[in-house]
Design a protein with these regions (language model features):
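Noncatalytic, basic helical substrate-engagement surface that gates or grips nucleic-acid strands
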Residues: 2-135, 141-161, 240-241, 247-265, ...
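Non-catalytic nucleic-acid-binding/docking modules located in mid-to-C-terminal regions
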Residues: 51-55, 105, 148, 161-283
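Acidic, divalent-metal-coordinating active-site segment for phosphoryl/phosphodiester hydrolysis
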Residues: 139-140, 201
Length: 283
């Protein structure tokens, strides 16, 4: 069976930029920890998953419709405008892009949506007759998991391939209810406020009792516990906004056809790639 590896490029960049020692510089004195970690992780993920197709997708710097829904969406993210260049993850993107070109792996930055939307589009369009592996630490992708779609949480030798069983055991809901679950509890990573008094266990029990978010809202007046009933009734608009922020659909144009993502293994080391693009000196 074909296997498409979708890499959340911005997520991986941040993971490597902040997870690697910050004093790694090359022969020119340029910080390269993000680039070094990114390329090494990407090559290891490819070896782990043996994909037939690969694409790396990045978030561009732009407003999107989610900000129109909620002005507070992702406002908890760092403001890089006042930081020196060596402290900004994006400063290493040119080298990462050069490495991807050398590896002949297609990549793109979003202009009017988020990379999440592209990855959802690929998963929903192509996940019925091939495996899709989404490499990201972002739990939003759990809602896309099914018998063919998996989420790879890369942590080197401790990496985890998350399936529907993982989601059910960890959160008490099936993947197709995960977006509703997250709408109820909120998402601190994206600054999405949940409903006061509703934690993971309460959210899971509500979804078990009423099926989905609309079922919960339709029956909110019948919820036995007064405080919970009032929280749901007062938070109905917030819940619908959260759902729109979190739910991923197949509603955007994709940057590449499936044929353009075909991957031809190169069997290269990280050092070989970085030397070829001039980030490291040859020995």
């Amino acid at each position: 069976m074909d296997r498409l590896l979708l890499v959340d490029g911005s997520n991986l960049l941040f993971q490597m930029f902040y997870g690697m020692p910050s004093r790694i510089v090359n022969h020119q004195g340029r910080a390269i920890q993000g680039t070094l970690g990114f390329v090494g992780a990407l090559l290891k993920m490819i070896r782990m998953t043996c994909p037939t197709h690969v694409a790396v997708l990045f978030d561009g710097e732009h407003a999107n419709e989610r900000k129109d829904l909620d002005a507070d969406y992702k406002t908890n993210r760092p403001d890089f405008s006042q930081m020196p260049e060596e402290e900004i993850p994006f400063s290493q993107l040119p080298d990462i892009f050069a490495a991807l070109r050398y590896l002949e792996i297609p990549f793109a930055e979003t202009e009017v949506c988020e990379a999440d939307d592209w990855m959802a589009g690929y998963s929903l369009q192509y996940g019925s007759d091939r495996q899709v592996i989404i490499a990201s630490q972002d739990s939003d992708f759990f809602q896309l998991i099914n018998q063919n779609v998996f989420v790879l949480r890369y942590r080197g030798d401790n990496s985890q391939l998350c399936s529907a069983k993982y989601v059910r055991e960890k959160f008490g809901v099936s993947p197709d209810r995960y977006a509703d679950f997250k709408a109820l509890v909120g998402d601190t990573a994206d600054n999405v406020r949940g409903i006061k008094g509703i934690g993971p266990k309460t959210a899971a029990s509500l979804l078990e009792a009423y099926g989905d978010l609309e079922g919960i809202l339709s029956n909110a007046q019948d919820v036995p516990k007064k405080a919970l009933r009032e929280a749901l009734l007062e938070g109905a608009e917030r819940l619908r906004i959260n759902s729109a922020l979190i739910k991923l659909t197949n509603s955007v144009s994709l940057p590449f056809s499936l044929e353009e993502t075909v991957y031809f293994p190169k069997n290269l080391t990280t050092r070989e790639v970085l030397t070829e693009i001039g980030v490291l000196q040859s020995r």
